[in-house]
Amino acid sequence: MNTEATHDQNEALTTGARLRNAREQLGLSQQAVAERLCLKVSTVRDIEEDKAPADLASTFLRGYIRSYARLVHIPEEELLLGLEKQAPLRAAKVAPMQSFSLGKRRKKRDGWLMTFTWLVLFVVIGLSGAWWWQDHKAQQEEITTMADQSSAELSSNSEQGQSVPLNTSTTTDPATTSTPPASVDTTATNTQTPAVTAPAPAVDPQQNAVVSPSQANVDTAATPAPTAATTPDGAAPLPTDQAGVTTPVADPNALVMNFTADCWLEVTDATGKKLFSGMQRKDGNLNLTGQAPYKLKIGAPAAVQIQYQGKPVDLSRFIRTNQVARLTLNAEQSPAQ
């Protein structure tokens, strides 16, 4: 009889009232319950007064009530049944509407973010393409300008070369003027021939190279046949043999270039003299000598192989960027931009 009366009394009480009575029986205050459940005191007060905060979703409200019931030792199922009877509409309608509005706002925000991202991406791609095109166009214009300059210089040099007359008939070599005395002396005995050719070492090597054929002809023509037969080695004494002409020593600062394709090139030495300026064809070779350091401009670095002081010059950084190579080769063979 008493149990049924208590059960009827509990059913008459609301969810908030039952929680408040259980809290008071345990001697707990609203502040203590709020601290244990990590809630605000105002939230605990609204639950006990059966108020549902407008900014609080029904899912969270049910979770708070379940935690509160466990704290005060009340069966959770009884409280949830009573809560559904008190506010069935709010649990059915309010939550879906709020979820729909949140999803709509999130979708709108994501759309704006995606649009802005694509806009930034297009701007970056456009700027990169414009920069590349301007750089490529500037390089092509520079190569064209340098090729035109070299063509103009070659044409002017060819015109000057055609206007200069050749004076080979009027110029006389000092060594050739001494030929008549040599022929007169060679008519004597064979013992006088070394005396005539003895002054030859004092003559310049370049003059010896020119005079030696004429002197050889004069000696062989003027000397009688028996005299030529009496020589031990059977050869007439040539001035070039007695002069001791030495081959020139290779310049240590020589610049050697081999071309694997057509390439425009300009080389200037330390004095500002242009050693070469023009177009080199495929499979061509170029050997230049001047005063170091050398300044080089190469239109197609991938088409040329350079050796300086017997060592190869690295052009890989210009080949990777596909740009006109401007470098300086100093005495230590350290190319610099």
From Swiss-Prot:
UniProt feature, compositional bias: Low complexity: 168-207, 219-235
Subcellular location: Cell inner membrane
Family: Belongs to the RodZ family.
Gene name per UniProt: rodZ
Transmembrane segments: 112-132
Pfam families with a match to the protein in the record: HTH_25, RodZ_C
Function: Cytoskeletal protein that is involved in cell-shape control through regulation of the length of the long axis.
GO biological process, one term: regulation of cell shape
Protein name: Cytoskeleton protein RodZ
